[in-house]
Design a protein with these regions (language model features):
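Short polar catalytic/cofactor-binding loops
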Residues: 9-11, 35-37
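Glycine-rich beta-strand-centered segment in the early N-terminal region that forms part
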Residues: 20-35, 48-97, 102
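Short glycine/threonine/proline-enriched tight-turn/helix- or strand-capping micro-motif at secondary-structure
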Residues: 10-19
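Short hydrophobic/aromatic patches on the structural cores and recognition surfaces of FHA
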Residues: 17, 41, 64
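Extreme N-terminal starter segment of soluble prokaryotic enzymes
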Residues: 1-2
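Cytochrome P450 core scaffold surrounding the K-helix E-X-X-R motif
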Residues: 40-46
Length: 103
């Protein structure tokens, strides 16, 4: 599959990545049909997020279709259209160190 990827400071690229697999019973795999790049991704591009290392996929605001689910997943099923809330945080600032992510 292809994914928009942080390559190095100042550079994103569309790269080939392995297709994800279910690892845990609570996992779900979503085929992304639309994603956006927001200010969080731009902070990554400019090197302002220490935990963002080259190779991570960006574009965490997305919608898609559920492809598969683990045995403990009960709220969605394959074929459902979903939006994904992926919280990102730096882990370094006052708020993150106090457990208040996404502030």
């Amino acid at each position: 599959m292809q994914a928009y990827t942080y390559v190095e400071k100042g550079k994103f690229a569309l790269l080939e990545k392995p297709k994800p697999v279910l690892l845990h019973e609570r996992d779900a795999i979503v085929k992304v049909t639309l994603a956006s790049i927001c200010s969080s991704d731009l902070h990554i591009k400019h090197g302002s997020v220490p935990r963002a290392v080259p190779g991570i996929t960006v574009g965490h605001e997305m919608v898609g279709v559920v492809e598969s689910v683990g045995s403990a997943v009960t709220h969605v099923k394959p074929g459902d259209r979903v939006t994904v809330n992926v919280e990102t945080f730096c882990g370094e600032c006052f708020f993150c160190k106090k457990g208040f992510v996404n502030n």
